[in-house]
Amino acid sequence: MPSPKELAAGLIKYAPGAVDFGHGPRFDNPDQPKAEGFFGRIPLSNGDYATEYSVSQNIDGKNVEMPSIVPTLNKEELGHVMRAAETGSPLPNSVYDKSLAHAKDRISKGQSPFWQIPESYTPMPK
């Protein structure tokens, strides 16, 4: 897996300061690319991979896009997200709850809900 510095060397194709990781644009803001996510690229059984699996939730009356793959997920919850990424199956409420709590915490610190360079990757849940 590449280091954050190696990832930062990627070509900028989007808004100023946005690094293109090759995952396509965000659904709610096509000027911003999807990033690597807190766990990096997670392989799926279909040969593809997931990095963020974004969801939208309401924060203070605004619809906010955020990753459902967050460091507070346990192994079972991460498995549900991976299945949803492959099949479109619904996510359990616990994933939405943790995604929302994680996003609110990061926003309160002036951070994006999403992983950003130069953050380190989070170890996978066991």
Language-model features and meaning:
Residues M1-K126:
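Charge-dense, intrinsically disordered terminal/linker segments
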